[in-house]
């Protein structure tokens, strides 16, 4: 086998540059994302990514909900969070944070979006850790 390849092997800076160059026009309404993998909020759509080994990606082991941001206020967030937490319990997804911290993250992410009217979507996943069938290989759940 030859040591040369026509398929590029990218460095981290090259990969980030390509992610930035590859942002599609529909991403114009991707305002902010909290990533428990990164441990913070990003506002650049190119960085709004999920690890391939996250069980949400290859097993569908996740739950989600959507709240409405209207006039800068999150409408009925507490009932939405309650539903998310019930769904997570049913799906046997442990919480990566206490409820209060999840609530704060949703508020902070909505604020970072700099929008006054938008849909706020959030997911709880079994998390990354491998490509097997069971969640036991996950290193921790993701929000």
PLM regions with names:
Residues 1-143:
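Conserved alpha/beta cores of soluble small-molecule-handling proteins
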